């Protein structure tokens, strides 16, 4: 017997509706990454950028990801890590370290 996978443990929670929900969450995450990347580039170029509402959108992404069955949520881990990295890069541009 091979290793147990989450799909094997939760087979009933991996239907077409769950797959559509996961794809929707994936699209939202991809959009957030693109938006933050664009904002970062504009900020680096000296432009003013309004990021109001971005925290709510990231919160929506996280909540929707948590609503997915475990196996599908786990598939989003690389996207979540990429989003986190982009949030960190954008935050660093917004609040650069002060020289001593």
Show which residues each predicted segment covers.
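C-terminal-biased regions
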Residues: 2-45, 49-100
């Amino acid at each position: 017997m091979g290793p147990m996978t989450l799909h094997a443990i939760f087979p009933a929670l991996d239907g077409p509706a769950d797959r559509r929900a996961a794809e929707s969450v994936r699209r939202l995450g991809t959009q957030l990454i693109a938006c933050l990347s664009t904002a970062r580039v504009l900020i680096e170029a000296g432009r003013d950028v309004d990021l109001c509402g971005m925290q709510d959108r990231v919160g929506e992404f996280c909540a929707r990801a948590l609503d997915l069955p475990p196996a599908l949520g786990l598939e989003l881990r690389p996207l979540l890590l990429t989003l986190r990295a982009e949030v960190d890069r954008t935050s660093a541009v917004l609040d650069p370290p002060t020289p001593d």
